[in-house]
Every structure is written in structure tokens, then in C-alpha cells.
Amino acid sequence: MAFKSGFVALIGRPNVGKSTLMNYFVGKKISIISPKPQTTRNSIKGILTLDDAQIIFIDTPGVHPPKNKLGEYMVKVSEKTLKEVDLILYIVEAIDSGIGPWDEAILEKLKEVQTPKILVLNKADLASKENIEILKSLFSGRLSFEFIIEIAAINGYNCDVLLEKIKKLLPEGPKYYLDDMTTDVRESFIVSEIIREKILLNLSEEVPHGVGVSVERFSEREDKDILDIEATIYCEKESHKAIIIGKGGQMLKKIGMQAREELEMLFGIKVNLQLWVKVKKNWRDDIAAMKMLGYNLKEV
């Protein structure tokens, strides 16, 4: 049997399960999950290697009108990804009542690319068969799809069927990554994303969008099984800094505790996590600051 390989983009509006699906296929947490828009800022790769295929999933930033240079970067990353991959998974919620504004924008973008597409109806376990059939008809009337698959990424329902359809559409090709690799991003990047996820989950809508995380130290002690991590949380306003720190430092302590617990599970080692908060005004419009915070502007 010929070996298949290729790059698969995941696109969809916020909170439809893109990151959950990629993390499910890869078998570990690669991409952070949050109900807030613009959670994913970079194209994050999750690598699944099987006996007969290697699939590189790419969780793309959402398609949205940019409000600053960071927003422009995210849109460019998403558009570039859609043009370069072998297959696009367009993910929508099976419980949706119709095609909303976010999906209208995504459909328009997808019309511009000739890449094969699969429509994935996620959260099918929560939807009626009638609603699923209505959505299939609505979306297939707007765009041509190779397959339409209903799944539940949270528990893996029908994901095996989706996987087989993905393999069917991928070209024959080589292994691009070693068998044991599940992502190509640095460990320090995953650390910064997990910290940012905890900020997204704990704070109100306004603050998280202006937050970036820089990991200054990531080192394992020679004499003890302890991983020392030092990171700085950057925000754009003094008022946001006060909110992140919280009364008596309680919010920062909560964010740090949640991040540390997840990092210890991820790395299988005790983690000593130190967090600081600094203000860098308008960093999302500052190219140098964006580079410092890990946004690879050369990609776009």
C-alpha cells in the first residue's frame, strides 16, 4: 500500500472545536482551547504518524477583520496556510441554526482556493438528525465538498471515519517528520500558549486580546527533577495589569497554579513557575514587540 502524507488546515469560527479535534488526533495537547475569539494566533502544527500515512494538521488563526498589526498578521497566516495545504477541514457546529456572519466570511475565503475540502459537522452528539441534514444542505449549496462528515471531537465519535476520508484525499508522499514528533513548535512556545490559555479562561473579554507571553527561562535542574520556567505576561494598559495580578495577587496566583499543574502533566516533572506582568503599550501594533513575543513575521 502506498504511503500517504500531507498538510491539512483546520478552519472555522471560534469555539467550533478546531483545537480539540487536532489535539484528539495527535493524542496530546498541542493547541490551546478557549471559547474566546482569536485564541489561536499562529499556525500550529500537530503531527499524526500512522503505518500508512503522516498527516500534519494545522490549526489556523480565524478569518476576521484585522484591528491592528497582530490582527493583520493572523489573517495573512490563515490565508497563506489555506493556499499551501493539501486539504482543508472546514469545521462548523452541528447545533448551528444556519450560516452566521463568521461562516459567511469563511465561505467567501474558501471560494478563492481550489484545495479539496471536507465539511466537518462537530458536536453532532448534541444535534438532531433534522438539524444536521439542514446544515448539510445549506453548506453544500454554497460550496463544493469532497465529503461531509459529522463527528464529536470531544469524545472521538466518528473521528475514525473522518481520518479515513482524510487519508483518501491526501497524495502519496514521504514522511516529513520523525515518527515520534507530535509538533514542530518549541517547548517554550507551548509553555507560553498554556499560560495564555489560562489568562483567556480566567479574565474578561477585553483584557486577554491585549496579552502576550514571553518565556525567558526554560531549564531543568541538573541535581533535581525540577523544571524552572520564568515567563513575563505583557499587556497594553496599567488597568489590565492590575486585573491580571488581581487583589492581593490572587488572580496571577490562580493563573500560575493552573498553568503549573498542566505543565507538570505535560512534561511529567515538577515545575517551578515564576510569572511577572509588564505593560507594553500598543504592542500589537509594534513589529519589534511582536517578534519578541514569538510571532514569526517572516512567514507572511
Swiss-Prot record:
Ranges for region G4: 122-125
Q: Which keywords, in A-to-Z order, does the entry hold?
A: Cell membrane, Cytoplasm, GTP-binding, Membrane, Nucleotide-binding, Ribosome biogenesis, RNA-binding, rRNA-binding
Main localization (coarse) = cytoplasm
Cellular component annotations (GO), alphabetically ordered: cytosol; plasma membrane
Report the coiled-coil segments: none
Disulphide-bonded residues: none
Q: Where is the Era-type G domain?
A: 4-172
Q: Which SUPFAM superfamilies does the entry mention?
A: P-loop containing nucleoside triphosphate hydrolases (SSF52540), Prokaryotic type KH domain (KH-domain type II) (SSF54814)
As for subcellular location, the record says: Cytoplasm; Cell membrane
Query: A GO biological process this protein is involved in?
Result: ribosomal small subunit assembly
Region annotation G5: residue ranges?
Answer: 151-153
Provide an example Pfam family for this protein: MMR_HSR1
> Is Transmembrane helix set as a keyword in this record?
no
Which residues are in the KH type-2 domain? 195-281
**Spans annotated as G3:** 59-62
Residue positions annotated to bind GTP are: 12-19, 59-63, 122-125
> For the region G1, what residue ranges are annotated?
12-19
- Similarity field: Belongs to the TRAFAC class TrmE-Era-EngA-EngB-Septin-like GTPase superfamily. Era GTPase family.
Q: How does it assemble?
A: Monomer.
The protein depicted here goes by the name: GTPase Era
